């Protein structure tokens, strides 16, 4: 009787239970905060989700019962490999910067692709693949083109790509959106979007590097899954939808077809309200009458490999802020290897949302990551950004443009400049908070929550996904996955 009632309610609501496969291999903690929220939202809508993922977060852990099931397939070797990859990036590192356009090459990124290969060769994953199960849709991490092979292995299920923030140019190309422009829509790997000849050359070089990376990935795919495995370009044809966890205003209001959905950002903030700080730390912050500055460069930066001179610059900055408490998220080994100024509390981990929501936290020195900036915006804490990799350069520049942060040059910044920037955002804190409120009003204007929007379009792909040969069922534009030589040159006669 209960089953019949539940089935009836689902039918009336326009949704039916679906079996969903999510392949989310990159072991980056902040990314999985977003993916966890998405998967749990699917389960809350009574969908059954099987997740191939590293052991970072327990997606099934929750304080409530869900009508859908979450099954986790652990690719557990990947977290250690990923740390090794980040650590090895020191060979290409500039002062304080892990990765920019000069280090984004096919050669450097093959280590990441090989990590995906090894994850999918994991005993847990091989055992799962041997079950020959069927799914209604396959959701794949947008940064991991190698994982598109799961759309082939579980065909004819349509494919959705999801990103915790910005999309890659290749993601946009796959679904027929505007993927590239050196000025208006710069590649997210660039550290500057200045529109000059150098910018155009960088765009062209990045395009060629990712084409080479795709060809090398093709060779690995055929070795791992058989000689008849489609190429990356062919696998992209299966992608029907791209979900991006940010508001389009950050992406310069890029012109996109409905196959690209900007969720608005802050998806992970829907999981649960901020937790309370531990008692001792809360006492310290309560006593910080001149304010506390929180310093964290995110979960992907290995502070053990921070350039020594950059590390000293940070310590000199903290000393200049001697009338304020500084909370510094840093590995224990680093904290023990230096002489900390008396105003610094150094720990390997802080509950970031709880810290930012404390009334005495007055500034946030950050790498400019999307999840961190979402948390700071909601807490109304002005930011000073020191971007270090990937989309952080572009995102930091946008935050400064909107008047909610200062963005500094990580390679050249001095202790005096950093201390001055921190002092400026604190002195002008009320104006920063007003601009943060205005930005949040824009971002939150859509009545649908990020989770609701993600579920709505996921369910649309599930419903119409097997009819994609009918043009009225597709969300993509006719230019989807078209080679640029055809896109610009070839016309019907």
From Swiss-Prot:
Keywords assigned by UniProt, alphabetized: Glycosyltransferase, Signal, Transferase
Pfam families recorded: UDPGT
The EC number(s) this enzyme carries: 2.4.1.-
Tree of life domain: Viruses
Gene3D superfamilies membership: Glycogen Phosphorylase B
Residues that span the membrane, as ranges: none
InterPro entries: Ecdysteroid_UDP-Glc_Trfase, UDP-glycosyltransferase, UDP_glucos_trans, UDP_glycos_trans_CS
Signal peptide segment: 1-17
Disulfide bonds: none
One Gene Ontology term of the molecular function aspect: UDP-glycosyltransferase activity
Family as reported in the entry's similarity comment: Belongs to the UDP-glycosyltransferase family.
Alphabetized PANTHER family for the sequence: EG:EG0003.4 PROTEIN-RELATED, FI06409P-RELATED
Function, as annotated: Catalyzes the transfer of glucose from UDP-glucose to ecdysteroids which are insect molting hormones. Expression of egt interferes with normal insect development and block molting.
The name this protein goes by in its record: Ecdysteroid UDP-glucosyltransferase
